[in-house]
Amino acid sequence: MSSFVTNGYLPVTLEPHELTLDIKTNIRNAVYKTYLHKEISGKMAKKIEICKDVELPLGEIVNNSVVINVPCVITYAYYHVGDIVRGTLNIEDESNVTIQCGDLICKLSRDSGTVSFSDSKYCFFRNGNAYDNGSEVSAVLMEAQQGTESSFVFLANIVDS
């Protein structure tokens, strides 16, 4: 995983009942709820600091809500094709084999190996190696996929140890 820090404005939408004396708290909560640990366009905000010494730009009324661009210092995380990650092998059935790596889900394609069911548990076989469901494995990221709200998703192949 790689990361970078940038300054920017994050747009958030506030409802009329949120425009009270607690507006700073409501803005902070809206920024965190909308952006923190959410995968957007291949990157995920891991840390957000709202700049308190910068004035807020004027809000814009949109459909009976107020859109405010909030000045922030944002630490983003992202993954590259070719990165090697380590996680837990999860076999739900023959066609759904993934590796869970925190904020990353690696999907294994059918040609990555074979799934077998023996002794009341699934096993994944690749190049003569057997990997039990729930075991720790390493994988190389092959292709970025559409992510979920709070996870990156990549096609990957297990790295033989």
UniProtKB/Swiss-Prot annotation:
Keyword Cell membrane listed: no
UniProt KW Magnesium keyword: no
InterPro entries according to UniProt: DNA-dir_RNA_pol_18kDa_poxviral (IPR004973)
Gene Ontology molecular functions: DNA binding; DNA-directed RNA polymerase activity
Induction line: Expressed in the early phase of the viral replicative cycle.
Catalyzed reactions: RNA(n) + a ribonucleoside 5'-triphosphate = RNA(n+1) + diphosphate
Signal peptide span: none
UniProt KW keywords: DNA-directed RNA polymerase, Early protein, Nucleotidyltransferase, Transcription, Transferase, Virion
Function (record text): Part of the DNA-dependent RNA polymerase which catalyzes the transcription of viral DNA into RNA using the four ribonucleoside triphosphates as substrates. Responsible for the transcription of early, intermediate and late genes. DNA-dependent RNA polymerase associates with the early transcription factor (ETF), itself composed of OPG118 and OPG133, thereby allowing the early genes transcription. Late transcription, and probably also intermediate transcription, require newly synthesized RNA polymerase.
Family as reported in the entry's similarity comment: Belongs to the poxviridae DNA-directed RNA polymerase 18 kDa subunit family.
Protein's name in the database: DNA-directed RNA polymerase 18 kDa subunit
Lineage: Viruses, Varidnaviria, Bamfordvirae, Nucleocytoviricota, Pokkesviricetes
